[in-house]
Amino acid sequence: MRYVAAYLLAALSGNADPSTADIEKILSSVGIECNPSQLQKVMNELKGKDLEALIAEGQTKLASMPTGGAPAAAAGGAATAPAAEAKEAKKEEKKEESEEEDEDMGFGLFD
């Protein structure tokens, strides 16, 4: 991902065909070390491709991927409803108790 981001940064700044040295310079400017074999692989994959088309293709691929928590929450929603109601009732009871404690402001020590 870091190599793709550096490549896009170089390309969007006006360098139509960034070299590996350009990418290494960008990454080293922020303290990131380069793995030459991974960088070369990314460069070979991106060479000669239209960046806007790649971005559009990536967006469609990301849109088709399922999100992490949504299916599990939808499936277990009906089963957790009674538990949620019980938690709310317990919270209300605790809240009422704490309000009573606040009213005496600590003067109930000698009652």
From Swiss-Prot:
The record's section on Gene3D superfamilies has: 1.10.10.1410
* Signal peptide bounds: none
Phylogenetic lineage? Eukaryota, Metazoa, Ecdysozoa, Arthropoda, Crustacea
Question: Where do Low complexity bias regions lie?
Answer: 63-84
GO cellular-component term (any): cytosolic large ribosomal subunit
| UniProt keyword list | Phosphoprotein, Ribonucleoprotein, Ribosomal protein
Quote the function comment for this protein: Plays an important role in the elongation step of protein synthesis.
Q: What name does this protein carry?
A: Large ribosomal subunit protein P2
Q: Determine if Metal-binding is one of this entry's keywords.
A: no
| GO annotation, biological process | cytoplasmic translational elongation
Q: Where are the transmembrane segments?
A: none
Which Pfam families does the UniProt record give? Ribosomal_60s
The family database entries (PANTHER family) matched by this protein are listed as: 60S ACIDIC RIBOSOMAL PROTEIN FAMILY MEMBER, LARGE RIBOSOMAL SUBUNIT PROTEIN P2
Any idea which GO molecular function terms this record carries? structural constituent of ribosome
